[in-house]
């Protein structure tokens, strides 16, 4: 299994167990980002009622049960908020950091990143109110932000990652 980690904080933010797709169904964005679908799962109430054969056992299930989004729960992501102005300042700084990282580690990616990042960020800013933002476990603002949005009538969000801000680690 591959785990995707933030290049600046080592936060684990995704894995290859999620099928990667074109962000926002825009194939050009795939060169710098990827999108994955999340699922809801039930967490808690680990008492499976093995010793309790009564009909009342079903009633006891609700108290400790919580519905969670699998990616948020598995990678301990935390929701964060930005105004459009705050996000603009953050993303400008972050893109410069990623470009510098690429110059040092993957120089062949620098020009692609700089060219493709502009329309991607423009899409985020144009649709800003449709997004929720998440941070990795460290809650470090130097890390990449993970974008979440709901597509159509889906009941769970999709998550979008800037791939040049991540590295893969095999387990």
Curated annotation (Swiss-Prot):
<comment type="similarity">
    <text>Belongs to the TCTP family.</text>
</comment>
<feature type="domain" description="TCTP">
    <location>
        <begin position="1"/>
        <end position="171"/>
    </location>
</feature>
<dbReference type="InterPro" id="IPR018105">
    <property type="entry name" value="Translational_control_tumour_p"/>
</dbReference>
<dbReference type="Pfam" id="PF00838">
    <property type="entry name" value="TCTP"/>
</dbReference>
<dbReference type="InterPro" id="IPR011057">
    <property type="entry name" value="Mss4-like_sf"/>
</dbReference>
<dbReference type="GO" id="GO:0005737">
    <property type="term" value="C:cytoplasm"/>
</dbReference>
<keyword id="KW-0106">Calcium</keyword>
<dbReference type="GO" id="GO:0020020">
    <property type="term" value="C:food vacuole"/>
</dbReference>
<comment type="function">
    <text>Involved in calcium binding and microtubule stabilization.</text>
</comment>
<protein>
    <recommendedName>
        <fullName>Translationally-controlled tumor protein homolog</fullName>
    </recommendedName>
</protein>
<dbReference type="InterPro" id="IPR034737">
    <property type="entry name" value="TCTP"/>
</dbReference>
<dbReference type="InterPro" id="IPR011323">
    <property type="entry name" value="Mss4/transl-control_tumour"/>
</dbReference>
<keyword id="KW-0963">Cytoplasm</keyword>
<dbReference type="InterPro" id="IPR018103">
    <property type="entry name" value="Translation_control_tumour_CS"/>
</dbReference>
<dbReference type="GO" id="GO:0005509">
    <property type="term" value="F:calcium ion binding"/>
</dbReference>
């Amino acid at each position: 299994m591959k785990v995707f980690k933030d290049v600046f904080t080592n936060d684990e933010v995704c894995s290859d167990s999620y099928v990667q797709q074109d962000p926002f169904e825009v194939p050009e964005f795939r060169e710098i980002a990827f999108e994955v679908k999340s699922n809801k799962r039930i967490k808690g109430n680990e008492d499976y009622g093995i010793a309790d054969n009564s009909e009342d056992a079903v009633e006891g299930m609700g108290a400790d049960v919580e519905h969670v989004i699998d990616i948020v729960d598995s990678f301990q992501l935390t929701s964060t908020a930005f105004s459009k102005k705050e996000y603009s300042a953050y993303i400008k700084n972050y893109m410069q950091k990623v470009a510098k990282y690429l110059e040092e580690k993957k120089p062949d990616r620098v020009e692609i990143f700089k060219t493709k990042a502009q329309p991607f960020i423009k899409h985020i800013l144009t649709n800003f109110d449709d997004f929720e933002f998440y941070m990795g476990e460290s809650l470090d603002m130097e890390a990449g932000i993970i974008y979440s949005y709901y597509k159509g009538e889906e009941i769970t969000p999709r998550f979008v990652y800037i791939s040049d801000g991540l590295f893969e680690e095999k387990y």
